[in-house]
A protein has these predicted regions:
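Alpha/beta-hydrolase-fold catalytic nucleophile elbow
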Residues: 107, 153, 192-195, 214-215, ...
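Serine-hydrolase catalytic machinery in alpha/beta-hydrolase-like enzymes
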Residues: 44-46, 51-54, 59, 66-145, ...
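Alpha/beta-hydrolase
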Residues: 68, 74, 194, 261-264
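C-terminal catalytic histidine-bearing segment of alpha/beta-hydrolase fold enzymes
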Residues: 246-299
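Short, flexible/disordered intra-domain loops and linkers
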Residues: 86, 115, 119, 224-238, ...
Length: 299
């Protein structure tokens, strides 16, 4: 009996190999830029702690392809917590590698003085780190990554970074950015925005990158529409969640598929005990289908 034909990048077909703990950059760490809002002592004691930033790279074994799509996954944690080994990030990366992707889960710099300046600086530092991770992955290697098929996704803070990569790379960086020279021969084809936000809807005018978005309509941390992250005006101006982002993207002619969810919590893919939820699998399969459709249209 003939086996059914495999649907490219939708049906698992490969064993997965992992290269763990790959150092992709060396950066000054916690509060490396200092903070005008914090005590002088904290700036002296805590700034410029050197960090080796690491990623875990997942790849299909025995695929034989000379050209693989890349998925860059970024964890959440309010720019304070989290790491590349979070169960959801690992599960997503393993699944996408089994489909034929190279998938990388990255660590990035964390921590900020609790102020608007502090959070903005933490976001900028983390975005610079994500840039560095992309530069590393797209550099000379045996990973066989196709620079025309790059995808970025993340949860919460990681989704903010994914949106920043897709849209800020094509526009102007905020001041003091240290964006690497990535060149012009690559493209982010689509973003998985899992309960993230943008600070300014005008950033969506910088590019034309499709967005797949999931978020609870009653998210207690990131506003579904417009509001204050963590419901704390002291650390941020108002931001725009997935509904506002998708509405503006659609008005600009950008494909945006929004999946509002009824759960009364922020993190949808894992429960309080750290176990994957049924929603994780829904997101995983929706993301695979969304990305595959973009590849069929050549991004």
């Amino acid at each position: 009996m003939t086996e059914p034909a495999r649907i490219p990048y939708l049906t698992p077909a490969f064993e997965v190999g992992v290269e763990a703990g790959v150092v992709y950059a060396e950066k000054d760490g916690y509060w490396s830029q200092g903070s005008s809002a914090g005590p002088q002592l904290s700036q002296v004691a805590l700034m410029r702690h050197p960090l080796s930033l690491k990623m875990d790279i997942y790849f299909p074994e025995g695929d034989g392809s000379e050209s693989r799509p890349l998925l860059l996954m970024m964890h959440g944690g309010s720019f304070l917590f989290g790491n590349r080994e979070e169960a959801g990030q690992v599960a997503w990366c393993r699944h996408f590698a089994s489909l034929g992707y190279v998938a990388a889960s990255i660590d990035y710099r964390l921590g900020f003085w609790p102020s608007r300046h502090g959070l903005l600086q933490a976001e900028q530092d983390a975005l610079d780190d994500a840039d560095s991770a992309l530069a590393y992955l797209l550099g000379p290697s045996d990973l066989r990554i196709d620079p025309a098929r790059v995808f970025a996704a993340g949860t919460s803070a990681g989704a903010i970074l994914a949106l920043g990569l897709a849209y800020s790379l094509y526009g102007e960086r905020p001041p003091k950015g240290s964006r690497p020279r990535l060149g012009t021969d690559f493209r982010i084809c689509a973003v998985g925005d899992l309960w993230g936000y943008v600070r300014d809807l005008s950033v969506l005018e910088n590019a034309h990158v499709p967005i797949l978005a999931f978020q609870s309509e009653q998210d207690p941390v990131v506003p579904f529409d417009r509001g204050y992250p963590m419901q704390a005006r002291v650390v941020s101006d108002a931001v725009y969640g997935t509904r506002a982002t998708c509405e503006r993207a659609t008005a600009l002619g950008i494909r945006c598929a929004l999946h509002p969810c009824p759960e009364k919590r922020h993190r949808l893919h894992m429960d309080k005990e750290g176990r994957l939820t049924p929603r994780y699998y829904e997101i995983r399969d929706a993301m695979a289908a969304f990305f595959a459709e973009e590849m069929r249209s050549l991004c």
